[in-house]
Each structure stands twice: as structure tokens, then as C-alpha cells.
Amino acid sequence: MRRRLALVVLVPFREDDTLARRSQLDHLIQRFRDVAFVDECAPALVVVAKQTFDGRKFNRGQALNIAYAVARERFSSEIDDERTLVVCHDCDMAPRASTAALYFERPSARPGTRVLEASGCRYAADGCFGGVTVYDVESWVATNGYPNGFWGWGGEDHAQFARTVAAGVRVERVPNAAFDDLEQGVETVELKLARLDESNARIRQKEKNELLRLDAKNWRNDGLNALRFSVVSEEVTVSTPALTCVEIDVELLSERPGYAVCHACERDLPESDYSSNSLRRIKWMRERQRTTMHGKSCADCTKKLPNQVAERRNIEANEANLEERLTCMDCATKFESRNALFKHLAATSCGDED
């Protein structure tokens, strides 16, 4: 008899400056194994999508989408679209025994989603989701997952709430769910924001507002159906009849809507900061380093292009004539440097005019 998963739990992960996230993740998986997911008749799959150290801010929404895509690809035969539930789960919320049963309760209406709200949660719940949200598969797919374009902390949960409402999915809130908060020293919103600001991890308010505006218009085209990623490594860390845990290191490749990475300076900037006419002049500068071309360079880099082009052409001309420029034209001896060639010319009759 083929196994049918009761839960697919999606956990987004990125180590931070405190180096505490890994221990939180280990604690969470152990709690899943010992307390929450112990029934062999209701097996759970946990997929942890770990964003690589790519120099960019954490993208929680895209990591959640990737975790689901990997689950569908690797465990498609075990996912029942009518019965399996999809859980979006932060790594710093460890469920207590009294909360375990709540994961397996279906929304009372379909399509529907249930938000497990932690007692004493530091965040206001209106207009957004908390750290643990349970969907039926139909509802999750109807929202098109999370937006892919929120690079940094904050905003993606507000966007996901708006998607859920726009998709006609009913939201049920389950108050006072019992979790242990694994993130220490940030008992208030102010402390949390202060820590994020110290590491420049937050999305700026102006940028967040613009992303929310764009997502309200484009959510059907940016989400599960617009994913680009590369799996760097994959490891099964738990394999029991009741629980399977897979950790994947992934390179996130989906860019945010309305933004593009400049080929010259590699900054992620709004499209309004770019000149499309510059593609012809800069494509050759980046094509050896980048495999995809969005056809835009920012205005600042466009201003610098004439000097950059001239400099690059001089370098290429020198490289093309390097062998000739290191060879004595009289005796055909080749030297390792121009200085060595000049010393040779000074010490011999080579190069003397008759």
C-alpha cells in the first residue's frame, strides 16, 4: 500500500549573524520527531529550504515556494491533493505537545487556511500571517504560494494574506496555540526590529510598500508558477515511519517583479533606474560571468560606460598583441615581460637603426 502524507511542512532557513538559527532548526526538528509528528498512520514530510550565502538578504517567501516545489518533485506519489495539508513553518517556533493535534485539523471550509497563533505572540496578527499556517493543497495552490520578490525581513506575510483573500480562501485563526519561542532576547517587536536593523536585514518601508503594491497587481504571475532555483545539495536527516526530513541548500534565482540586477554593478534596483538602450554597449562586459541577460543597466553605470568601454578595448588590444609586444623583432627572442625586452634591447645591437 502506497504511503500517503498527512502533512508537508515547509521550513525556510537562513543562518544569521548570531549563528543561532542552526541550533533553532535542530531543536525544531527534534521537537517534531519527539512530540508533534509521531503517528505512523499520519506521516509528515518536512522540507527545509536553506538559502545559500549569496550576499543577498533572506528571502523567506521564495524559500517556502522552493520547499514546496521540491516536495512535489521528490514525493509527488505520496501527496494526496484531497487529504495532504501544507504547513508553512518558521524555524524558531517549536510546538508543545498540546499543539500537535492542531497541525492535522483541516480548515472548516474549502478553500481554507488555518493560522496557528502563538500565545503571547509579539506581532499584531491583523492583515498578515504568523509563523505557522496550515493550508489544504487546493488553497495553497490557489494563492500561487508566496511572492518571490521580498528580499529582506518583513512584508511577505502581508502579501500572502492579501493573496489568500484575493484568491477567495477563507482564513481561520486558532488563538493561544502553545509554542516555545526559540529566538531569545527579542521578546518585543522593538527588540526584534533593533536586531534586524543592526544586521541590515529589514526591507525599507518605502520599498516594502512598493512591493506590496506590485504584488497586489501581479500575484497570479509571481509565485509557485515563476520559480527559478538551483539545488546545491540535498540530505535526508530524518527517516522514520512517522517523519521524513529533507534539508536542501538552494540558490535562489527568481528576481523580484519590477526590479533587475545591473550587469555592470550587480545592484538589485527598480526598473525605473535602468536604461534599456545600454544593452548593446554592456552585454559583452558581463556575458562571460552571467548566463542570463535581462537587457538593462542602471543610469549610473550608463554614464560611466564610455570610459569603461575605452578601458576595456585598450586591455583587449594589449592582450591581443601581447606576444608580439614581448618579442624582439630583430632576433625573434620572446621575453616574459616588457622590462626584460627593454633590457635586452639596451644590452645588444637589436633595435638599433642602421
Which sequence ranges carry the predicted segments?
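N-terminal C2H2 zinc-finger "knuckle"
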Residues: 263, 325-336
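Active-site-proximal specificity loops/subdomain of glycosyltransferases
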Residues: 22, 26, 39-83
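Short, acidic, metal-binding catalytic loop of nucleotide-sugar glycosyltransferases
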Residues: 2, 16, 24-42
